Swiss-Prot record:
It comes from Cupriavidus necator (strain ATCC 17699 / DSM 428 / KCTC 22496 / NCIMB 10442 / H16 / Stanier 337). GO terms for biological process: regulation of DNA-templated transcription. It is found in: Cytoplasm. This is Probable transcriptional regulatory protein H16_A0916. Belongs to the TACO1 family. The keyword Methyltransferase does not apply. InterPro entries: Integrase-like_N, TACO1_YebC-like_2nd/3rd_dom, TACO1_YebC_N, Transcrip_reg_TACO1-like, Transcrip_reg_TACO1-like_dom3, YebC-like. Its main location: cytoplasm.
Amino acid sequence: MAGHSKWANIKHKKAAADAKRGKIWTRLIKEITVAAKLGGGDVDSNPRLRLSIDKAMDANMPKDNIQRAIQRGVGGMEGANYEEIRYEGYGLAGAAIIVDCLTDNRTRTVAEVRHAFSKHGGNMGTEGSVAFMFTHCGQFLYAPGTPEDKLMEAALEAGADDVVTNDDGSIEVTCPPNDFSAVKAALEAAGFKAEVADVVMKPQNEVSFAGDDAAKMQKLLDALENLDDVQEVFTNAVIED
C-alpha cells in the first residue's frame, strides 16, 4: 500500500528535537509526572507511564531524573500540578493543527498558543474542530531500504493494524494506542527498531506546502512547538523540500 512522502518531514522533526535536547527532557519529565499521578508508578499496570519512560530512555535521560519524576507524580515529592489541555486550530490553507499541552496555568497557555497562531497566519478553532481529521494510533517509521516483506510479517504478527510503504520508500507501521508498547517490543525483538516510534494523532488526509507557503507554515509549527507548555503538535500539513 502506497502513501505520501514523509521521510523528510520526520527527519526535520527528529533533527529539531535532537537540537533542543534539554527542552525534550523537560517535556518528558512533565509527561512522566502526569502519567504517574494519573495511573500510579507501576509500569506494568500503567501503559502511559511505560511509554513516557521508554521515550525518556531513548532521549538518554538519567534514571535518577526519571525516578524523581515518578515519585513527584505519585506524591512522594512536591511538584507542580499540571493539567492536560488540547487546543485545535488552522494554519495556512486551512491545514489542521492539534496542540497538546501540560500546564500549571491555563490562562497563560491559551494566551501563548493563540498568539502563536495569530502571529503566523493561523487561527484557533473550537474543541473538536479538527480532531476528527486525525486517528489516535501507535506509529513506527522505518528508513527507506528497510526490508518490506520481513517487516510486514513481523508487524502483523506483533499485532499491528497496517503497514504502508510511502512514496519515498520509508515504511510506516500503525497499531492501536493501547498495544503500542507490546508491538514496539515485538518489532525490536525481531530486529526492527524504528527511527521514530510514538503514540500520535495521525492525519487521515494531508495538505502539501512548498516554497514561501511551506516556510510560513513551518514558522507557525515551530512557534507552537517552542512554547514551554506545549508537549506535542500534530498537523496534516506536509512541508515539501
